[in-house]
């Protein structure tokens, strides 16, 4: 047996090798079959993802002396429609069909944010005014657009007028609201104290009055934190461009008569915010809310009980900042609004003291719901970091009062890493206000910090825009596309305008204008994202009045959220990549809702450009 062992081992080895070779062959064949199957699936996926080649441009139009960019966009790999060879484009006057300009499309660019390829049509040299189309030989033609002075006047006015349509607790009259008139809803004069909000003389179930203010978004609740960033942005627009806004009319109720329309609108929400402060201790309730969202009905059909809920550091500091800024602005109108500025400042300083006593009071709705009834299921706005709100509030209070205590807080916090403004990130609003109003009162090193940081961010934006397939700052990085992405575009534009005001460098103003072009149609979806504007704009926003009023057109001037690959609403999206994940559906609160904190930066951006591009 021992002598036969080698023969047995050799035979076994041959068999094992044969099995191994066959197995390897089988595995390779299986891998190739799988690979082929994947290629077929990928090809089918691409066909499913195919987007018809189109010309994406600012559907509202262009200023005569400003850059004018349009983008031909189509699916990568498309050989049927997308122009691949050297191709001309033509600008055709709409009323005569005359060609007034021609040029060559730029080279093919591949988007880092989707499956799209693009070619750029640059017609900045065309300064003739009128209505035009762009035509690309053998491909496509654009929507009609205009070249004219004040081309974004309607964008500017409509975006501000949108806040009037969001007013709670009052009827919107036909004289001001047109066909979008409606009855009053949510009087909010009998609001219950939620068990989470009990303090002093305000017991659970006791009643306070907190009428007015703006509905926050597509729902009918009112949130201090989101009002904070919205109000700060609008107040800053007025401070930066006072003489422009003094003469801007939006057809809203006229009282107080001598106060500019933007401040009348701000005042409607300011009075509500002030009513959200506990007069006993200075803390501010997070929101005035139902326990659960109202259904898709008009405001006057809503009769659920309403509550104010737990106070929080973020809400309190937001009021401190807004009220301090409002104090100095409304003190310009002491005759029309006697005592308002003083009331705002008292509220602001009282809020600051509460936030000093409770520096880390987080509004954690999930935790709150484990302890108190009724459970609150509306938007949380649960910020957990407060250095940005504290810096913003300190900046506004220092500018308004000059007091050293706020000066010290600025010194402590000025080096914090503040991000692009949003409801949870307000620090840069302090930078903007200090550069606008506080420059003489801060040190040289603090000025350098503010200026250097803002310019560094702006320069990065401009650099990234040159690599973007649509040549806009928006979309320079994938992270630009999230919930409320269009507000990122508008807030990037504001930052660029702030740096332009510091430096007078034209490239920053051009970058801001490019982001307004993005919002108005120079983007991968081809939509102008503002209701009632352009040739292709949202018809089905997640916005209760627009859904329930029986009118085909949505309430105008509202900025839709924009592409959001998170798709948290689980609605139908035709495309799913960062810059294409948008659904014009009232189901889609993740991409097609509206919100006051998205409209506010649009107001700033559109109106600033109307002023700066027209040498107002």
Language-model features, listed with the residues they occupy:
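C-terminal transactivation domains of fungal Zn(2)-Cys(6)
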Residues: 322-381, 395, 435, 439-441
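Short coil/linker segments at helix-helix boundaries
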Residues: 236-268, 304-307, 325-344
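Acidic/aromatic-lined carbohydrate-recognition and catalytic surfaces
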Residues: 112-114, 141-157, 245-259
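Proline-centered turn/helix-capping motifs that create local helix->coil transitions or kinks
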Residues: 277-286, 357-367, 402, 463-467
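Solenoid-like repeat scaffolds
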Residues: 414-420
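Carboxylate/His-rich catalytic cores and anion/metal-binding grooves
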Residues: 261-281
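Bacterial Sec-dependent N-terminal signal peptides
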Residues: 1-4, 10-11, 15-51
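Aromatic (Trp/Tyr) and acidic
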Residues: 55-139, 149-150, 165-228, 232, ...
